[in-house]
Amino acid sequence: MQFKYLVPMLALAVASPALALDDVTVALAIPAAVHDGAPYAAAEELGLFKEQGLSVSFVVFQGAGALLPQVASKRVTFGYPVSEPVISSYFSGKDPLPLRYFYNGTPSQTLEYTVLEESPIRTLADLKDRKIGVGALTWGTIPNSRAALRVAGLEPGKNVEFVAVGVLGSGFQALRSGQVDALNYNSSWGDIFELTGTKIRRIAYPEVFLENPGNGFIAHEDTFRDNPDLIRRFGRAYTQAQYVCEINPTFCVQAFWRQNPESRPADAEGKGLENATTLLTRRLQRMLYRPDGTRRQPGEYDLDVIRKAIGAMAEAGEFPSADVPVDRIFSNEFVPAFDDFDKDALRQRAEAAQ
């Protein structure tokens, strides 16, 4: 799906003459699909952004490396990148990026290594002398992927190789055809692969990385200082949208398709709808709940987990040291505001939505 279809959809929240809305542009590193784009669509259709005084549009840049300068220069309001490039900026010898994360969008490790079920590869160590497919060699996730392999005793570039295979279908075909021995995609893409009928085996990252956050919403430090309420309102609307999609995933999927008709599958009332709601529900389960079933605090960062992961990255040679100001990069300042809304009233709206 080309994300250009999503941009005009999310730009429909136009300020009325009676109510001026604050324009917010959010930069993504990859196009949204139904499993991660449905909450945005739900927020638009139910007027959640508008109720928070926001007119939200989305743009896509090719990876975190292209996205981050847009936020740093204030050409966009918020971004949704992985954190490794931001952390790395503290080791550049120059001024670090003037950016801070304010919302933990993926509070557990979403990346995994995927092999075909019949593959002899069962552990990370088994990837020795193998080829691993990634979307592009510029992905901001690759430092963490390399670190995971080093923790398992491998040496990327010497006895294991990353290969660019593109995303989704092209990568799936690369694995099926034997062009690569494994894929390094996120878990939702693994779900999509399974729903094509292919039996796969998933290999998790080392434990130190399992609760390390992935993508999150980030803003310029000036926005924290000059317009903190903008952050609160956006984070609240996004939290509300995830809540709606947990209650009524069918509505959220169909909202995404209505606003992105090119993404609508042929069997949108049958198997296509079932698969899409499965993808969305699985993702929300991972994002909203811990492995033990307890509910996460929306948007919150576990700074101790992050410090341990940075330490492991440093030991693996991906960072020159673990000496970074974690509490400056990742902020929980606005977390109490994100779920400050009438959940019973929103549940009623979600259940009635069609």
Model-predicted regions and their roles:
Residues M1-V7:
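Bacterial N-terminal signal peptides that target proteins for export
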Residues G169-G270:
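Pocket-lining segment of extracytoplasmic ligand-binding domains
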Residues L21-S177, D181-S187, T198, I203, ...:
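Short, glycine-/small- and polar/acidic-enriched structural segments
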Residues P8-L12:
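Hydrophobic helical h-region of N-terminal Sec-dependent signal peptides
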Residues N227-P320:
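Secondary-structure end/capping motifs
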Residues A15-P17:
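N-terminal signal peptide c-region/cleavage motif recognized by signal peptidases
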Residues L303-Q354:
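Conserved C-terminal helix/tail region of periplasmic/extracytoplasmic solute-binding proteins
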Residues S57, E161-V163, G270-L279, V324-P336:
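Short linear loop/turn motifs
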